[in-house]
Amino acid sequence: MTQTRRDNSRIIRAKHGSELDATHWAAEAPLRMLMNNLDPDVAEKPEELVVYGGIGRAARDWESYDRIVATLKRLKEDETLLVQSGKPVGVFRTHKDAPRVLIANSNLVPNWANWDHFRELDKKGLMMYGQMTAGSWIYIGSQGIVQGTYETFVEAGRQHYDGDLTGKWILTGGLGGMGGAQPLAATMAGASMLAVECQPSRIEMRLKTGYLDKSATTLDEALEIINAACAKGEAVSVGLLGNAAEVFPELVKRGVKPDMVTDQTSAHDPANGYLPAGWTLAEWDEKRESDPAAVEAAAKASMAEQVKAMLAFWEQGIPTLDYGNNIRQMAFDEGVTNAFDFPGFVPAYIRPLFCRGIGPFRWAALSGDPEDIYKTDAKVKELIPDNPHLHRWLDMARERIHFQGLPARICWVGLGERHKLGLAFNEMVRTGELSAPVVIGRDHLDSGSVASPNRETEAMMDGSDAVADWPLLNALLNTASGATWVSLHHGGGVGMGYSLHSGQVVLADGTVEAAERVGRVLWNDPGTGVMRHADAGYEIAKDCAKEQGLDLPSV
């Protein structure tokens, strides 16, 4: 069977408007969102089906993509398409309230859950890496992580700088699909940012989409811009063309002191996502094909040097955090025994939100009309009137975030709020206030949908960091609740062997039946997050469960 991974002739964009290519909206929705993942304004390498995160793909190969598209176009209202690591493998009769698509990506039996075995299967065409929202068809560009990054920086500012990041600057690495959100999140939070990125195309994309203010080609130039802005109390973001493994140690050597340090390089995938120190991009590209083991070894050695620099900042009292790319683990494996001295961002800043089921709720307008998103923004403010922080976020998002592909919005809301918003959006579709249906989903990075001991479930108070039952239960419950498509993935964010996670997307098409599904899914999905944290002993989660009337027999 022919398998084509690269096709430069392909330019994919989702259909806009109310005319369907599928036979009904529940199949049209995943069709448009799959295509949206591969829009050139959205994906990192759309010609290779790569959406973000190293080699996070939307489909296994172009032949599989074409078969998925053809199948969705003919899928009946009582049928379910099964997708195995980016390849459509079956259509079965279920019922109208069942998911239209069920997706399993990158899942390996634990003893074989490592990059070496994955790469063997990947090379044979038997598997693909789905990341989190790449293979589950709900990536919305860098906006998808902007608010989570913003919330992290704001909370860090509260904890370390009395809530004021004016005149402060953050050092980071990586401006890919996820890391590209950092500069905008920083300036929204009031801080400047120096972001080190080795690929010029990524800097150019972040400048083009408004996520980055300026670029620099030398460290001196970048520091001059940062220092000038901080002196004036202004917030500016600078993308420095360079290698984080070289720039971080150089800053330590010079005695330069950022006010916060983190990293979002694709360290989770050392063979494909991290440029070794001293290497050119051309050498890196060639060696990834000819000698991936050498690339991985050199990349891990370079990560160790970067983490040593991060530890040096931490030891000087500078807030330093792992932003979930598993770089500490890579350094630890290279002999940096104190790599975990500085914390991950979830236990340091985000877990109290997870305890209340608050996480990255997102929706996209299938019409392609930005006005549909602006109307839903107003509806969120109307239904959640007493949250000025959320209102400020929505105002900033409208002003500063450029839509990529289909217009979309993200805002962090929790149990008791998500279902109200979803039902309101469905009603707006029914009355014609919105010009076409919307899809409502989230990142896999959420309170009840992931087991990842070096990220979302790091340092759980009961020691249950590695218990992977929770994302499985989340996926099963969302399937039973009637989500339009449900996904279960392995290895997203932190790489093979380090995470299991699930996702859901539900369609609001204005029908009574959709309202029932939306209400169930958007209550149950965040409810599993409160359940998971209450079960682990967090009092905030127990209180939330009691307030919301959750039935948790063991709590």
UniProtKB/Swiss-Prot annotation:
Tell me the PROSITE patterns matching this sequence: UROCANASE (PS01233)
Reactions the enzyme catalyzes: 4-imidazolone-5-propanoate = trans-urocanate + H2O
One cellular component term (GO) for this entry is: cytoplasm
Q: Does the keyword Membrane apply?
A: no
Its EC number is 4.2.1.49
Q: Which domain of life is it from?
A: Bacteria
Write out the residues that bind NAD(+).
53-54, 131, 177-179, 197, 202, 243-244, 264-268, 274-275, 323, 493
* Residues the record marks as active site: 411
Alphabetically list the UniProt keywords: Cytoplasm, Histidine metabolism, Lyase, NAD
Task: Kindly indicate whether the keyword Transferase belongs to this entry.
Answer: no
Record-linked Gene3D superfamilies = Urocanase like domains, Urocanase superfamily
| Compartment annotation | Cytoplasm
**Pathway terms, separated by semicolons:** Amino-acid degradation; L-histidine degradation into L-glutamate; N-formimidoyl-L-glutamate from L-histidine: step 2/3
Any idea which GO molecular function terms this record carries?
Answer: urocanate hydratase activity
Report the cofactor remark.
Answer: Binds 1 NAD(+) per subunit.
Q: Which GO terms describe its biological process?
A: L-histidine catabolic process to glutamate and formamide; L-histidine catabolic process to glutamate and formate
Give all cystine bridges in this chain.
none
The job of this chain, per UniProt, is described as: Catalyzes the conversion of urocanate to 4-imidazolone-5-propionate.
Which family is annotated?
Answer: Belongs to the urocanase family.
List the protein's name.
Urocanate hydratase
- Source organism per UniProt: Maricaulis maris (strain MCS10)
